[in-house]
Design a protein with these regions (language model features):
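Conserved ATP-binding subdomain of kinase catalytic cores across diverse folds
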Residues: 7-113, 137, 141
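Generic detector of well-ordered alpha-helical packing
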Residues: 108, 149, 167-169
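AlphaC helix of the protein kinase catalytic domain
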Residues: 114-123
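Residue immediately N-terminal to the catalytic "proton-acceptor" Asp
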Residues: 142, 147-149
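Hydrophobic residue at the +6 position relative to the catalytic HRD Asp in the kinase catalytic loop
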Residues: 149-156
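C-lobe/activation-segment region of protein kinase-like
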Residues: 159-221
Length: 221
């Protein structure tokens, strides 16, 4: 794929993702291309306090260790195994001496919205929350570590199926404490968005339903 495709100007149509559509907020993300064949272009950016100082540069330690190439390889493996993740289309890095910047292009998943937006529309029943837990277990059973599982990166399609976005710093791991830590991160994110919008349809019982779905799936594995 040509270098110009990694910029908004390299596409006839582009739409910057803003607000609740943004997955985690660390990337500069936009839709590019024409429906029905659209892509998501993401420029890697740092988060947190460091991101205010060094916006999008990373120390170069080898081509295979660049953020974009690592995420591309992980997504390719997961998509090949029919996991509900974006299918990777292209990745690149641009080296400047000791540092580099990176970009990733994935195929856009049609008709998905963030979990935070999905539960803002109306109260979702027990079956839905159990399905979220079951979907998370499917990833954990496959050893998939998601570094930033939150109410934005967990997405829901028009059929109510669960998808995962943003596998930056993700990896494949053996079972361990990281599985519970991932669940804890998602719970904190849901509590946080509830604090931002008290009308959100998320209650303690919903989290218990999610956990029931997760652990029931793990027992039947």
């Amino acid at each position: 794929m040509s270098a110009e495709r990694f910029t908004a100007s390299g596409w006839p149509h582009s739409e910057v993702l803003t607000g609740s559509l943004r997955s985690g907020g660390r990337g500069n993300t936009m839709f590019v291309g024409n429906i029905p064949r659209q892509f998501v272009l993401r420029h890697y950016r740092r988060g947190g306090l460091l991101g205010k100082i060094v916006r999008d540069s990373y120390v170069f330690t080898g081509e295979d260790l660049t953020r974009s190439f690592k995420e591309w390889r992980l997504l390719d493996k997961l998509a090949t195994n029919n996991m509900n993740v974006p299918r990777p289309a292209a990745a690149r890095f641009y080296r400047r001496g000791t540092f580099y910047t990176a970009d990733l292009i994935t195929v856009r998943i049609p008709d998905v919205i963030p979990l935070s937006q999905y539960i803002a529309k109306k109260d979702r029943g027990e079956a839905f929350w159990r399905s979220v837990g079951q979907a998370i277990w499917k990833f954990h059973e496959a050893g998939v570590y998601h570094a930033d599982m939150n109410a934005y990166n967990v997405q829901v399609d028009k059929d109510g199926d669960i998808w995962m976005l943003d596998f930056d710093k993700g990896s494949l791991k053996s079972p361990g404490p990281w599985q519970q830590e991932t669940l804890g991160r998602l719970h904190r994110s849901l509590v946080k968005v509830l604090g931002l919008d008290p009308k959100l349809h998320f209650h303690a019982a919903n989290w218990e339903e999610l956990l029931e779905g997760y652990f029931d799936a793990s027992k039947s594995a």
